[in-house]
Regions:
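Short glycine/proline- and aromatic-enriched beta-strand/turn motifs that initiate or cap beta-hairpins
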Residues: 21-60, 159, 220
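Solvent-exposed, glycine/polar-rich loop segments of beta-barrel outer-membrane systems
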Residues: 136-154, 198-205
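Hydrophobic alpha-helical segments of small multi-pass membrane proteins
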Residues: 51, 123-125, 168
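Short sequence motifs at beta-strands and strand-loop junctions characteristic
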Residues: 48-53, 94-99, 156-165, 205-209
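Extracellular loop and loop/strand-boundary signature of outer-membrane beta-barrel proteins
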Residues: 41-46, 87-94, 153-158, 199-205
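Bacterial Sec-dependent N-terminal signal peptides
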Residues: 1-28, 217-221
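Predominantly the C-terminal beta-signal and adjacent terminal strand-loop region
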Residues: 158, 163, 168, 174-221
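Gram-negative (and chloroplast) outer-membrane scaffold detector with strong preference
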Residues: 23, 31-33, 37, 61-143, ...
Length: 221
């Protein structure tokens, strides 16, 4: 008898949350800025500079209540950067790194019926899809500078293609109608996985911090 009472009580308590639960799916797109960090050791005239990149993909969210939901995205995100030398200005490298990122986030919403603010926080996993390089180099034999654009092949012993880290963002949402809504969000990705495996005696850790500004169009079921 007590078990039935507990079961009925649990159903009654969870019923309002179930009735309010709502699925939404959509498309998102925007642009980002990536900052690459690494220990340059004795390379005293080498410099690193952040660079802009694209960000677009799919999003899905399950709203448990009117103020809390679970969100997961799948995005194509670029983590680009520039490396150059101050003593040899001919040596200038621009790296384009394409990633597939899958953030899983807790989403907290607040505000009115149509215009709401939200905060997302969670973790992400990703995969380094491709890398390319363009810029200029100095030929030490001829003394001439030449420009190049080339694809960089991955080295299984050196490159760590698995990306893991923290993700979070702040944004606004406007409900156009019962089923449609648009969002604008500023989100940050902080990588906890080095791009380089520590296969040498000298440690070489390389990390990315990426901030994106993205807009999304959502359909609510």
């Amino acid at each position: 008898m007590k078990n039935r009472f507990y079961l009925i009580t649990a159903v009654i308590l969870l019923l309002p949350c179930t009735l309010r639960a709502q699925w939404s799916v959509g498309l998102l797109g925007g642009a980002g800025y990536n900052v690459h960090s690494q220990d340059l050791h004795y390379l005293t005239d080498h410099r690193l500079q952040g660079a802009a990149g694209l960000n677009f993909g799919l999003t899905g969210q399950y709203d448990v209540t009117d103020w809390f939901g679970l969100r997961m995205d799948a995005t194509f995100t670029q983590k680009n950067y520039r490396q150059y030398r101050t003593d040899l200005k001919e040596m200038d490298y621009h790296y384009r790194n394409d990633y597939l990122l899958v953030p899983v986030l807790a989403s907290f919403r607040f505000g009115g019926a149509r215009l709401k603010g939200f905060a997302n926080a969670g973790v992400y996993g990703g995969w380094w899809l491709s890398c390319s390089q363009q810029g200029s180099e100095l030929n030490s034999f001829s003394g001439k500078t030449y420009e190049f654009s080339r694809k960089v092949d991955f080295n299984a012993d050196k490159d760590n293609r698995l990306d893991l880290g923290l993700a979070g963002g702040l944004g606004m949402e406007y409900g156009i109608s019962r089923h449609w809504a648009v969002q604008l969000e500023a989100r940050g990705y902080y990588s906890l996985a080095s791009q380089v495996k520590q296969y040498m005696r000298v440690q070489d850790y390389r990390y990315d911090t990426t901030v994106v500004l993205q807009a999304a169009c959502l359909y609510r079921f």
